[in-house]
Amino acid sequence: RDAQESRGLGDVYKRQVRKSLPAEFSYIIQELLHESTIEPNKHAYINVIISTIISTRRADDFIIAMCNLIQRLTIDSLHIVGDIYDRGPGAHIIMDTLCDYHNFDIQWGNHDILWMGAASGNEACMANVIRLSMRYGNLGTLEDGYGINLLPLATFAMDTYADDPCTIFAPKTNFADSTYNEKTLRLITQMHKAITIIQFKLEANIINRRPEFGMGGRKLLEKIDFERGVFVYEGKEYPLRDTNFPTVDPADPYRLTDEEQELIEKIHYSFMNSEKLKKHMRCLFTYGGMYLVCNSNLLYHASVPLNEDGSFKHVNICGKEYWGKNLLDKIDQLIRTAYFDEDDEEEKRFAMDYIWYLWCGPDAPSFDKDKMATFERYFITDKSLHKETKGYYYALRNKEEICDRILEEFGVTGQHTHIINGHVPVKTIKGEQPMKAGGKLLVIDGGFSKAYQPETGIAGYTLVYHSHGLQLVQHDPFQSTQKAIEEGQDIKSTTFVIEFNSQRMMVKDTLSLIHISEPTRLLSISYA
């Protein structure tokens, strides 16, 4: 059966098949692919090959090789529209696979950028990464994947919050990567509170250092009346859900205690000396970017900031205005500067701070909301303060003319052009649809992360682009590999035809071949 599947896929691109064959079984697979029913002796020959594989106890290895080959031939190129590191467990396992993958690219999401900021040395990004891991009970990526030493944080948290129930910081165990006992859950809860308070302090230091970010209103510890246990915001008082702040000095709320400073230095050392993290981040930099234009499709994770009238929003960076394509190009350059630049210390420092801004800044294309209400969601019961207002892009992207304007800005032209978007999960249980603007824009973030699935009702989308057109595959939630084996469950998916081309697209019409054909044409002219 595997050989038949491979043969069917292999008939399309024969040279590509030969290049893709696993060296160990290359000769055998080629023989199976060219099996003929016309020659009777050939059939007996094939049977001997199969019998030999079984008798030499290589059947399992051969089946695995065939399965990998089928996957390899099915997907010529994999495009990931961001957020490998969004909340769910096993991001390091995904990155291990991608680092060895034959052909992929990624358009960085805000969660990816947060990890890139942590790997660049931004301590506020490190604190955010750890806080999110604690909140969702996913410690495996940090500890097992990257060897981040969380023992100093555990020791600090146990000492500082020994008698504190830390109730509001209990992890969301429904989405945890392991089953934790009561003692471990108690420790994670304390660690969660400890790193959250440190995060608020570190972020305030960036805001003080970069007034041009315009985020002074997000320094919220100073708005607490510690004696009365209330949060004072715009003249109104809100009771706090937690009033124990042993490490916060009301007179200087953003100063790290000596113990917190020592702790963050140890965390910094651990992040900066993780070889696996360095390898994975280099992979993200090598194969990633803020956006990609591919075969008349424009791919980016979140948004291109817009004004209310649909014009491109101008964003000031270091005294210069950027918008549209040049804004995303500038941000791409800043992210790389933060990680790689060792020559200009001030330029690198600004770029590192800006990576944090990309995580939660109102004019950041990777975020594009008025605020990230982290403090409010933890400490304030009143949900009116939890609201995060999206930028104008998210309302205007439903209009075809707006999508055409964005596509034109990025030089994407042709009859069948699309924007491929992610970032905001499609809540199908509320009737939301992934297709917008008459099919010009496709939102394919449906929530692979289990944390989103109760909101979306599905487990994400895969967009398939082939010679006949576009297909959107909607996935149902997948329980576990164990259940799939024991109960014969598979990943259930529903396929929708988005666009059908009566005349199939040829390989020569794809972007990669267009780039090759132009120099070939010039060579032909030169030769003539």
Where are these regions (language model features)?
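Feature recognizes metal-dependent phosphohydrolase scaffolds
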Residues: 1, 6-517, 521-526
